[in-house]
Amino acid sequence: HQTRNPVFWGGDIHSFWTTDLHADAGNPDSAVVATEFVGTSVTSGGPPFEAFNSILGLNPHVKFFDSRQRGYVAVDVSEQQMLTRFQVVSDVLDPAASVSTLKRFAVEAGKAGAVPV
């Protein structure tokens, strides 16, 4: 049995990322074989946004990056898709802070790759 849409999770870089992993990492036109989601932390700051954002054009496999927000990742799974939501906290120092969705991606059943929704 071969998995057609594996998903990997990370989080030690304290920022949000969505990345499609290609069969040939040096060829962005090669087949997408998996998706990687990275979640930020609620309390720790992330890498400098401008420094990373300025080189994203050199990394076409990166579909989304943001290190300016604090929050967490929420995932809903059904037979049709896996829906990933990047949730952000309005103020990490306020116990009554609100939570909102920064970005959403779906990975469809049987198909590799993240699709913004």
For each feature predicted by the language model, list its residue ranges.
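Long, structured stretches of catalytic cores involved in phosphate-ester chemistry, encompassing
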Residues: 1-117
